[in-house]
Design a protein with these regions (language model features):
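N-terminal Rossmann-like NAD(P)+-binding domain of SDR-like oxidoreductases, especially those catalyzing
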Residues: 1-174, 196
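Glycine/proline-rich active-site loop of Rossmann-fold NAD(P)-dependent oxidoreductases
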Residues: 149, 174-190, 198-200
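Conserved small/polar residues in nucleotide/adenosyl-binding loops
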Residues: 203-205
Length: 205
């Protein structure tokens, strides 16, 4: 029987690559995104029987509850991930990253989802010395990292209190297909690769 995976933030850089991988593995995928970020649109057609695209906000409990039925696995990537936006509007960051994550956890719990996979951030390590390890204390220096690490705490609580299996990944510098090419949020590794491809030195001083 085909597994059904729900991916939030499916129109984004990491989410869209994850959807492709899940499809390659034979999963049916429910793609969730509000398409609010610049240049983020669904990459798959409704005509493909393995994909369903749903434009809905993760803070919409009723909307999320309606599409969670029959889902086996949830990959929760949707978030306010832009640092400057979170600093300028911390209330909105908390709404998306804390409330949105709690809505997703509750809907997953009610639907009997087998596993909930949460995408967090290495920003939670803050000024901890390198190399970073899981046993280091959290050191959240801005609303983005604070709200994302709060999401981790909710994942742990839903596991301990309700028995929902949760997994947390803290991403560092992610790069790949459809990653931002330029601007504040372009991965530094991608920038180095473009410099190399253009025959330029990797760092200009």
């Amino acid at each position: 029987m085909t597994s059904v995976s729900l991916v939030t933030g499916a129109a984004g850089f990491i989410g869209s690559n994850l959807v492709e991988h899940l499809l390659d593995q034979g999963h049916s995928v429910v793609c969730v995104d509000n398409e609010s970020a610049n240049n983020e649109k669904f990459h798959w057609s409704h005509e493909n029987g393995m994909v369903i695209n749903v434009k809905v906000d993760i803070t919409d409990y009723k909307g999320m509850k309606n599409i969670m039925s029959g889902v086996d696995y949830v990959f929760h990537l949707a978030a306010e991930s832009r640092l400057q936006s979170a600093i300028m509007n911390p209330i909105e960051a908390v709404k998306k990253n804390c409330v949105g994550t709690t809505v997703m956890l509750q809907c997953a719990r009610e639907a009997g989802v087998k596993r909930f996979v949460y995408s967090s951030t290495s920003s939670g390590y803050g000024n901890n010395p390198y190399p970073n390890v899981e046993t280091q204390p959290d050191d959240c220096l801005n609303p983005y990292s604070a709200s994302k690490i709060a999401g981790e705490k909710f994942c742990k609580m839903y596991r301990d209190l309700y028995g929902l299996e949760t997994v947390v990944f803290r991403y560092f510098n992610v790069f790949g297909n459809r990653s931002p090419a330029r601007g504040q949020y372009a991965p530094v590794i991608g920038i180095f690769q473009r410099q190399k491809d253009a025959g330029l030195s990797l760092i200009h001083i």
